[in-house]
């Protein structure tokens, strides 16, 4: 009803992991076109959907200590989603430690702590090094990592929420390969939440070429269909106009197909477009072609400030909903 679509992919075997190119685990994608609009009711519904999935992947049967890590550079708007989420959180760990649950009027509550580790250019340290030290000293039961992502398609920019129970590799979307925040590196479960906030120039060009190719394909098929209809109308004619036949044309005629002088040209047009689409490496090719002039260029929406602001509240409210209001 609200045009929200959720896709859950579970990779449970090593063969599946190799095929998908991802570690074993659960991957959840929530597609919500309305996220680009500041509609409080719509965003509240998305928060509830995210909270429901967080409750499914995190074992919340007992009281837990949860560390929320806001990845990204708070000085760059498109990369500041994680820091904004942590700033919006209701942090409870210190209050429960000092004053007990009674100070919050609760009999049971998860202890939430948060950290904004910044980026290596600001701290001189890997994010993984900072988080490892915090995990070692504060001993949380699990980590929730929030980060802005790079979209592979312009259509997913700011309108999809991705969750995973396999952790995250900071900066990998924009070519900065850093140490991962995973259960293997931290020793505790790591859950990742991300929203694509930038899209590469290569992705925009790739989408455009793909759309143009699809239009050309439809046009060729439409013209071909019109010609077939015209041929049927002229069925009363005793003989079609023929030109020199190729071996392929002879085979077509032998199998009961019709052949006219227009068909070789039309057949070549049909064959050309699938050939273009068959190349799976097209995206990498586009990146290489753009590299000399544009390099690793990334684009953001014109209203990125506003989007980061209300999307950060959507995520922080989802975390609150999962940890404070779970049954």
Q: What are the roles of these predicted feature ranges?
A:
Residues 1-63:
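Extended, charged alpha/beta regions that create polyanion-binding interfaces
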Residues 66, 141-142:
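Conserved acidic residues
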Residues 71-81, 121, 148-152:
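Gly/Ser/Thr-rich loops at beta-strand to alpha-helix junctions
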Residues 73-110, 114:
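Glycine-rich phosphate/diphosphate-binding loop of Rossmann-like nucleotide-binding domains
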Residues 104-134:
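A structural-propensity feature for long, helix-poor, extended segments
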Residues 115-116, 145-326:
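A structural signal for small-residue-enriched, beta-sheet-centric alpha/beta enzyme cores
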